[in-house]
UniProtKB/Swiss-Prot annotation:
Active site: 181 (acyl-thioester intermediate)
EC nos: 2.3.1.181
Protein task: Catalyzes the transfer of endogenously produced octanoic acid from octanoyl-acyl-carrier-protein onto the lipoyl domains of lipoate-dependent enzymes. Lipoyl-ACP can also act as a substrate although octanoyl-ACP is likely to be the physiological substrate.
Lineage, highest ranks first: Bacteria, Bacillati, Actinomycetota, Actinomycetes, Streptosporangiales
Biological processes, Gene Ontology terms: protein modification process
Matching CDD domains: LipB
Keyword Acyltransferase: yes
Family annotation (HAMAP family): LipB (MF_00013)
PROSITE patterns: BPL_LPL_CATALYTIC, LIPB
UniProtKB keywords: Acyltransferase, Cytoplasm, Transferase
Species annotation: Thermobifida fusca (strain YX)
UniProt keyword annotation of Cytoplasm present: yes
Pathway: Protein modification; protein lipoylation via endogenous pathway; protein N(6)-(lipoyl)lysine from octanoyl-[acyl-carrier-protein]: step 1/2
Protein name: Octanoyltransferase
Length: 236
């Protein structure tokens, strides 16, 4: 997959973003990227607590009782997961070269996350048949394989949406109310839980920007704080 152009990061700030507002911003950026009105862009943010159900979510994956946060059906792949404070969510809105290779793109996101957590001393890995980034089982500590980052994407008209979520210092009990990503035989973890010290979203922003730009082959990258100012959409 050849290089993308300059990658523009928008850090939406420390206040958690309601999911529907973030999703609408993705859609507005997506149609402008398809029309070449904006550059390749990545939204970096934290969400208010929310469960998002991808297209493969079954009724058995959903909360059986009131989970304490909205459950929203969305147009990405995958099953159900949680987003909320203490979790870095990244939404690349990037034009991929033809022919599209969705698997290669997902592997790039996984590689970026593996490099990010590697900077903090953790050895991330892939698990065959499962997306996301994992930590190996630790039988001596009584720990199964643990998922530290979830990935779910949508590609339409050659441009990506949705992306990945990396657990930093979020409350992991939110995942107890669902079958996260449809996987029953593994755990969920965070940087803070693994390192036994607080690692917040702000602590991993620079590493995330650097490694994601590198795996996407961006010629350069820069960060803008705040929500993007969108040009008026012109439908070609």
């Amino acid at each position: 997959m050849k290089s993308v152009s300059e990658l523009l990061y928008h850090w939406l700030g420390e206040s958690p973003v309601p999911y529907m507002e973030g999703w609408e911003l993705q859609r507005q950026l997506h149609k402008r990227r398809v029309a070449d009105q904006v550059p390749d862009t990545v939204l970096l943010l934290e969400h208010e607590p929310v469960y998002t159900a991808g297209k493969r979510t079954g009724p058995w994956d959903r909360p059986l009782t009131d989970p304490g946060a909205p459950v929203i059906d969305i147009d990405r792949g995958g099953k159900i997961t949680w987003h909320g404070p203490g979790q870095l969510t990244a939404y690349p809105i990037v034009k991929l070269p033809a022919p599209l290779d969705v698997v290669a793109y997902v592997r790039m996101l996984e590689e970026a996350i593996i490099r990010v957590i590697g900077d903090f001393g953790l050895s991330g890995m892939r698990v065959e048949g499962r997306t996301g980034v994992w930590l190996a089982a630790a039988p001596d500590r009584g720990l199964p394989e643990r998922k530290i980052a979830a990935i779910g994407c949508r590609i339409a008209k050659g441009v990506t949406m949705h992306g990945f979520a990396l657990n930093c210092n979020n409350d992991l009990s939110w995942f107890d109310r669902i079958v996260p990503c449809g996987i029953r035989d593994a755990g969920v973890t965070s940087l803070t839980a693994e390192l036994d010290r607080t690692v917040g979203v702000g602590d991993i922003l620079e590493a995330t920007e650097h490694h994601l730009a590198a795996v996407l082959g961006a010629s350069s990258y820069r960060r803008i704080a705040g929500w993007p100012v969108l040009p008026e959409f012109v439908d070609a």
